[in-house]
């Protein structure tokens, strides 16, 4: 057996081709940790109807950003960067919740490598049962069904880690530098939305998001800012205000310069590359916003990788 520790990076995933869009959406819409559609036994049938209707439109979104999601390559790069920081005692693996490599794939690879110790690191900074909770539930289910025996530790949040806040603040400051006068800029933090019912049932996601914004603005300094939510995925009430409504409100208030800050996303994918850059960018231009800029995603930011490495070192003690 190997003395190495497996670093298992848990991420949402994304289609690696246009043909993979349909199965990706099916995996998403049949996950009852994030979306409950009718009784459990009916959800696969209802999900298929929804996905059959949505898939052509979503395929077009992916076509506009290169025909696939870059999230696998970006997550693997984060893993490689972590290995360099942590040294030869660690080896990284990736488990995508709704695409390949799946949790089953990742655990099989760890087993083949003869590694017995695993640190599962969720790449969602803000805990929610719909994201980290779902990934951990899937991991525990696969472990139980496979009978695999690992010594396993979990890292399920880092929304207030000083290095995460520093890395995010760095990106905001860099984004502000692209404007002639930062005093004229509205900083718009855009987080992935969740059904309002999750928060009412005690999910800490919104509290975590708000704390991240507070801590980032402490480092960035003075500046007008707001928090909104994107990527609503069903008809039930989700967190508000929506990003679309916020951009419209900013335009009506006479704001001309917006800095979009993707929050709850640590890698570029459809929510940043299409929704913010293309969809919201076009909407903002049509509404009279003169300068619409998105701060860079963290991806393999050195500060962000240092944050993840610190989390792993703490979990490994």
UniProtKB/Swiss-Prot annotation:
* TM segment ranges: none
Reaction catalyzed: heme b + 2 H(+) = protoporphyrin IX + Fe(2+)
Q: Key word Repressor present in the record?
A: no
Which positions in this protein are listed as binding Fe cation?
Answer: 192, 271
E.C. numbers: 4.98.1.1
Q: Which CDD domains match?
A: Ferrochelatase_C (cd00419), Ferrochelatase_N (cd03411)
- Give UniProt keywords alphabetically: Cytoplasm, Heme biosynthesis, Iron, Lyase, Metal-binding, Porphyrin biosynthesis
Which processes are annotated in GO (biological process)? heme biosynthetic process
Localization (cell): Cytoplasm
Cellular component (GO) terms are:
cytoplasm
Lineage, top-rank taxon, reads Bacteria
Enumerate the Gene3D superfamilies for this protein. Answer: 3.40.50.1400
| Family statement | Belongs to the ferrochelatase family.
Q: What does it do?
A: Catalyzes the ferrous insertion into protoporphyrin IX.
NCBIfam families given in the database record: hemH
Q: What is the official name of this protein in its record?
A: Ferrochelatase
């Amino acid at each position: 057996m190997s003395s190495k520790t497996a670093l298992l990076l848990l991420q949402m995933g994304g289609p690696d081709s246009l043909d993979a869009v349909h199965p990706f959406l099916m995996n998403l819409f049949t996950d009852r940790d994030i979306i409950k559609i009718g009784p459990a036994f009916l959800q696969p049938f209802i999900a298929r109807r929804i996905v059959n209707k949505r898939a052509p439109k979503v395929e077009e979104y992916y076509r506009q950003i290169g025909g696939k999601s870059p999230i696998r390559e970006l997550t693997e790069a984060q893993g490689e960067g972590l290995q360099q920081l942590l040294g030869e005692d660690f080896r990284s693996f990736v488990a995508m919740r709704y695409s390949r490599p799946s949790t089953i794939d990742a655990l099989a690879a760890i087993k083949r490598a003869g590694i017995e110790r695993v640190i599962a690191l969720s790449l969602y900074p803000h805990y929610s049962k719909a994201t980290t909770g779902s990934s951990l539930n899937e991991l525990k289910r696969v472990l139980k069904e496979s009978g695999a025996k690992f010594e396993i530790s979990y890292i399920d949040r880092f929304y207030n880690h000083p290095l995460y806040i520093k890395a995010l603040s760095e990106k905001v400051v860099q984004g502000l530098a692209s404007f002639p006068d930062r005093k004229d800029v509205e900083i718009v933090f855009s987080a992935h939305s969740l059904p309002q019912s999750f928060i009412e049932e005690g999910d800490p996601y919104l509290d975590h998001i708000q704390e991240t914004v507070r801590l980032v603005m402490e480092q960035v300094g003075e500046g007008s800012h707001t928090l909104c939510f994107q990527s609503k995925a069903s008809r039930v009430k989700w967190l508000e205000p929506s990003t679309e409504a916020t951009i419209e409100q900013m335009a009506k208030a006479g704001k001309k310069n917006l800095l979009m800050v993707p929050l709850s996303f640590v890698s570029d994918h459809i929510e940043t590359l299409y929704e913010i850059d293309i969809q919201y960018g076009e909407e903002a231009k049509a509404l009279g916003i003169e300068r619409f800029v998105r701060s860079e995603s963290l991806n393999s930011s050195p500060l962000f990788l240092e944050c993840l490495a610190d989390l792993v070192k703490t979990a490994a003690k």
